[in-house]
C-alpha cells in the first residue's frame, strides 16, 4: 500500500515537531524548507493536524506550531487512518465503483483486505515516540540546534 503525500507530510511534520526541544515553536516555512515541501501543502496538513489535536498552533507575533500532545499518545496507525482518504486499494473494495465481473467469487479481495488489516495492525503498535528514539540523529539531519 502506498501512502498519499498528505499522510507522508503529516507524519514528517509530527516527526519534526517531536524532534524539537519540548515546548519549542517551529514554523511552516522552517519545516517546508527542511523537507523541500510546498508551504501551501504544509499549511493544509498542519491545519488538519491542529483540528485533530496532534499539533497546537499559536497565532500572531512569536507564534508557531508545536506538538499538541505527548509523542507517546500519538499512535501512528491512528494518524494514518485519519489522514488517508481512501483505503480502497482495489476497485472491488468500493461497492459503488466496483465493475469487476469476478468480484462475487474472487478470493483476491479477501487476501488484500487481510493484508491491509495486517498493515494497519503493525502501524497501531507504534507511537510517535517510537519514531524519534534516535532524536539526536534526526536533529542533526534536520539541522536543528540541540
UniProtKB/Swiss-Prot annotation:
For the ligand ([2Fe-2S] cluster), the binding residues are 92, 100, 106
In alphabetical order, the GO MF annotations are:
2 iron, 2 sulfur cluster binding; DNA binding; DNA-binding transcription factor activity; metal ion binding
Q: How is the cofactor bound?
A: Binds 1 [2Fe-2S] cluster per subunit.
Q: Which cofactor does it need?
A: [2Fe-2S] cluster
What is the name of the gene encoding this protein? Answer: nsrR
Record-level GO BP terms = regulation of DNA-templated transcription
Q: What is this protein called?
A: HTH-type transcriptional regulator NsrR
State the DNA-binding region(s): 28-51
Under the heading NCBIfam families, the entry gives: rrf2_super
Task: Give a short account of what the protein does.
Answer: Nitric oxide-responsive transcriptional regulator. It represses the expression of flavohemoprotein hmp and the nitrite reductase nasD. Probably plays a role in the up-regulation of the resDE regulon in the presence of nitric oxide.
Amino acid at each position: 500500500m502506498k501512502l498519499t503525500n498528505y499522510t507522508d507530510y503529516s507524519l514528517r511534520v509530527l516527526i519534526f515537531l517531536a524532534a524539537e526541544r519540548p515546548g519549542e515553536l517551529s514554523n511552516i516555512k522552517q519545516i517546508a524548507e527542511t523537507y523541500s515541501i510546498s508551504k501551501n501543502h504544509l499549511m493544509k496538513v498542519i491545519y488538519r493536524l491542529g483540528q485533530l489535536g496532534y499539533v497546537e498552533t499559536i497565532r500572531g507575533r512569536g507564534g508557531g506550531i508545536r506538538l499538541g500532545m505527548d509523542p507517546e499518545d500519538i499512535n501512528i496507525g491512528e494518524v494514518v487512518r485519519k489522514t488517508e482518504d481512501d483505503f480502497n486499494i482495489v476497485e472491488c473494495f468500493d461497492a459503488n465503483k466496483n465493475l469487476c465481473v469476478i468480484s462475487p467469487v474472487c478470493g483476491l479481495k479477501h487476501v488484500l483486505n487481510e493484508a491491509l488489516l495486517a498493515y494497519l495492525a503493525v502501524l497501531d503498535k507504534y507511537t510517535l515516540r517510537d519514531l524519534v528514539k534516535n532524536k539526536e540523529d534526526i536533529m542533526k539531519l534536520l539541522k536543528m540546534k540541540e
